[in-house]
UniProtKB/Swiss-Prot annotation:
The keyword Transmembrane does not apply. Residues 1-258 form the Peptidase S8 domain. SUPFAM superfamilies: Subtilisin-like. This is Uncharacterized protein y4bN. The keyword Cytoplasm does not apply. Coiled coil: none annotated. It comes from the Bacteria. InterPro entries: Peptidase_S8/S53_dom, Peptidase_S8/S53_dom_sf, Y4bN_pept_dom. One of its GO terms (biological process) is proteolysis. CDD domains: Peptidases_S8_Subtilisin_like_2. Belongs to the peptidase S8 family. One of its GO terms (molecular function) is serine-type endopeptidase activity. It comes from Sinorhizobium fredii (strain NBRC 101917 / NGR234).
């Protein structure tokens, strides 16, 4: 399969310019245990970097408790989602791809079944699908990256089994039928249906930004995502890491990914760094964003595509990270982060209050090739001035053959109050 995948993606990219690939396949014999990824995943990671393409992979499906006792699909949901046997299927653990899990569009009951007390739904709208496989990814990184609608299951005691969209369309996702001479449309349930929906969103981003790199597409999509409140509430009994392992960064908001609005501004850049170097980007902060007690959020998303090697324990050959600094002059920031010779002495210390406490912290986010974190203010921040600085660092690993690492960064400023943030920031940038 890896060689076939390489041949197919390379040919489609070279001959037809295809830049988005959706792979709704998985090896049921290769459940990712958090250790090394397989050769299939490594091949996709290599192709994403070599060809500058967006590869989207379904997380994989599993019947609740593998179908041993079907009624447990209802009574023990959502606990079984975190079982060891419900981890991602190869190649969904790949690092440079977008891995997609599934959420339900509703309870799956149609008009005929809604009044039958014997039929029991498992989910409500926007809760994790009972078949969706989960992370975390390599080294504890965030996987799946995103979720989208992929259907649900219902328990039908009349036939003593769980039923999905294949035979109860209300439980599934409407799609075209491959046997179109018999019937044009059909339905189904699975992450194989949620992955193409993310592919559509990626296509919309490329239509708006035709020259965007794969890194920028990933960064914009993941920056826009939010975990549905219904999913968070359903998973909270399973602990703090359950939401990240099941839903990743959440469900894409396509308008948010592609556009700014009056109270929300998205800035982005594409760049590359030599190994063991860093870059500092100024983020203008309008006065209206600094003042008052309204809730304001800065969200940062970094995406890069490191070289990988399947045979190594340290799979990625390059690492990247970021910090958000406020209240400091650029010269001080450069002095703080640059490498220093021994004769120069220690670097100048930076007070904690100047280093924005982004969540999740670096130990969690730096395990992934798409890193997202944010900070929310509920009081005035005038004392830190009208410029924040984003420090992006590139750290060498085993990939000594690599000179520079490409990446994309997205920074979003969001203010809940009714203010014309976009207009104020545009004036600052033009000035």
């Amino acid at each position: 399969m890896p060689s076939q995948m390489r041949e197919a993606i390379t040919r489609l990219n070279e001959e037809f310019g295809c830049r988005i690939f959706v792979i709704s396949l998985g090896d049921k014999k290769r459940v990712f245990d958090g250790g090394k990824v397989g050769t299939w995943a490594a091949t996709l990671d290599e192709l994403a970097r070599e060809r500058n393409v967006v590869i989207i992979v379904s997380a994989g499906n599993r019947g609740p408790r593998a179908g041993s006792r079907v009624e447990q699909g209802v009574t023990e949901y959502p606990d079984y989602l975190l079982e060891a046997n419900n981890r991602l299927l190869e190649p969904a653990g790949a690092m440079n791809v977008i891995t997609v899990g599934s959420i339900a569009q509703g309870d799956g009951l149609d008009a005929d079944m809604a009044g039958d007390v014997r039929v029991r739904p498992i989910t409500r709208a926007n809760e994790p699908s009972p078949f969706s496989r989960v992370g975390p990814g390599l080294g504890g990184g965030t996987k799946p990256d995103l979720v989208d609608v992929g259907g649900t299951l219902i328990f039908d005691p009349v036939v003593a089994r769980l039923r999905g969209g294949e035979d109860r369309p209300s439980a599934g996702v409407l799609t075209l039928n491959h046997n179109y001479l018999n019937r044009l449309f059909t339905a189904g349930s699975g992450t194989s249906y949620s992955a193409p929906r993310v592919g559509f969103s990626a296509g919309q981003i490329l239509a708006r930004f035709p020259g965007a790199s794969a890194n920028l597409v990933r960064a914009l999509l993941i920056n826009s995502a939010e975990v549905p409140q219904q999913a968070s509430e359903r998973l909270q009994i399973l602990g703090s890491e359950a939401v990240r392992s099941v839903c990743g960064h959440g469900l894409i908001d396509l308008e948010r990914a592609g556009f700014s609005d009056d109270a929300r501004v998205t800035l982005y850049t594409e760049d590359e760094l030599p190994l063991d170097h860093f870059a500092v980007y100024r983020i203008p902060i309008p006065e209206v964003f600094q003042e008052g007690n309204t809730e304001r959020t800065i969200r940062v998303t970094l995406a890069y595509d490191p070289p990988v090697r399947h045979t190594r324990n340290d799979y990625a050959g390059v690492g990247m990270s970021f910090r958000l600094v406020r209240g400091c002059e650029p010269n001080f920031i450069f002095e703080h982060y640059r490498k220093r010779a021994e004769v120069e002495g220690p670097f100048p210390e930076m007070e904690n209050r100047f280093n924005c406490k982004l969540e999740p912290g670096p130990k969690v986010r730096e395990k992934s090739s798409v890193q997202r974190a944010s900070i929310t203010f509920k009081r005035g921040i005038e004392q830190y001035g009208d410029s924040y600085y984003l420090v992006v660092r590139c750290e060498s690993g085993w990939a000594t053959h690599v000179d520079r690492q490409p990446f994309a960064v997205v920074v979003e400023l969001l203010q809940k109050a009714e203010v014309r943030l976009y207009e104020r920031l545009r004036q600052r940038v033009r000035a």
